[in-house]
A protein has these predicted regions:
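C-terminal beta-strand edge segments of enzyme domains
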Residues: 67-130
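Active-site beta-loop-alpha substructure in enzyme catalytic cores
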Residues: 1-58, 63-64
């Protein structure tokens, strides 16, 4: 989705656990990603790990909006967060409904020695499409 701030890549829930989707959004020039989740206990570690990985490996910020509360047998863990391009968590809302703001560096200075984008080997990806 194109905005005055740049292109936003949208990911829905479980899709954040697959690196190919986030990489495709990065290659389509997404400047940052937004993930809408309904992650529940005991899987809160999953959205932490995968979201931080997607930010780091694609060198773009990731925002996670996760449901909070209980419905039937499901206990949703909340913990919406904003992660910068170096995988640092800038904001975490934990387990309360809150509204907060955070300054997000859209064009962040990154360590060129740790550039996953520059060092990717697309010539080795053929096996992934089989």
């Amino acid at each position: 989705m194109d905005t005055p701030l740049g292109s936003i890549g949208m990911i829905i829930c479980f899709d954040v656990e697959f690196p190919e989707i986030a990489r495709t959004l990065k290659l389509m020039k997404a400047g940052f990603m937004v993930t809408v989740n309904i992650n529940m206990h005991p899987y809160e570690l999953h959205h932490h790990l995968f979201s931080r990985c997607r930010a780091m490996e694609n060198e773009i910020p990731v925002m996670i909006c996760n449901r909070l509360g209980t419905e039937g047998e499901f206990d949703f863990c909340g913990d919406s967060m904003v992660i910068d391009a170096t995988e640092e968590i800038l904001l975490s809302l934990k387990d309360k409904e809150q509204v907060k703001t955070v300054s997000l560096p859209i064009k962040q200075e990154l360590d060129p020695m740790r550039s996953y984008t520059a060092n990717r080997r697309a010539d080795m990806y053929d096996i992934l499409t089989k």
